[in-house]
A protein has these predicted regions:
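Glycine-rich, aromatic-lined ligand/substrate-binding cores of catalytic
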Residues: 1-153, 159-221
Length: 221
């Protein structure tokens, strides 16, 4: 769900690549003191924090991801009986002049407090995709690269996907143990070099960044 929930702040703020990531996640036990470890599947719940370098003249931006039933604190501007997001989740963007809340897929963007929405008429500036993104994708393939205007071209979707994978990278590193089996050196703030696509302060995490493909299946990147 990361692509659907992180897309609104990623697109509107123009985040780019994160420079650091850290996380915490739940543990499950099959008996006393023996935690289950299933590194190839997601945890029951997790919390991830990323930092994005600020644009010229603007501060850095922190992005917080929560799942598995973990929710952020309710904004003070939101009434006690007003819904936060929607049934599947949502996003809250906090700026210097206020907050905006939306549901999953960016549905129903709302200024907070919600009273600020009264009488508000925001003009539509982004092109809509009435045929749906499946048809848009097929039409773009038929037309050829660069011929059609897309709502999520590779130039945008690539950095967005890399951002979400940074969260997975932190989660995979979280339970790496040292030689004693008692310490977890990956439970730190991981520093990301986006140009060279590597973690600079915990080399063991880089095993999850790239892989060696079988002969004949190598990617051209």
């Amino acid at each position: 769900m990361g692509c659907h929930l992180i897309d609104p702040p990623f697109k509107t703020v123009g985040l780019g690549y994160p420079s650091e990531v850290e996380c915490s996640m739940s543990s499950t036990y099959h008996e006393m003191w023996n935690a289950l470890d299933h590194p190839d599947s997601c945890p029951v719940s997790s919390s991830v924090k990323m930092k994005f370098p600020g644009k010229p003249g603007k501060p850095d931006v922190d992005l917080h991801w929560m799942d598995g039933g973990i929710r952020p604190d309710r904004p003070e501007e939101l009434g006690p009986d007003e819904p936060m997001g929607d049934g599947d989740g949502g996003a809250i963007i906090t700026g210097t002049k206020g907050k905006i809340m939306c549901g999953t897929y960016g549905h129903r963007p709302t200024l907070l407090p919600t009273s600020r929405m009264q009488g508000l008429n925001v003009p539509q500036t982004l092109a809509r995709v009435p045929e749906g993104h499946y048809v848009q994708w097929v039409n773009a393939c038929i037309a050829g690269y660069g011929k059609n205007q897309l709502s999520s071209p590779f130039e945008y979707a690539g950095p967005l996907t890399e951002t979400i994978l940074m969260g997975n990278l932190a989660l995979r590193s979280y339970n790496i143990k040292d030689v004693t089996g008692k310490q977890f050196p990956g439970r730190k703030k991981l520093l990301w070099d986006a140009v060279n696509m590597k973690i600079t302060n915990f080399d063991e995490a880089n095993q999850f960044v790239k892989r060696e493909y079988r002969p004949g299946w190598k990617l051209g990147i």
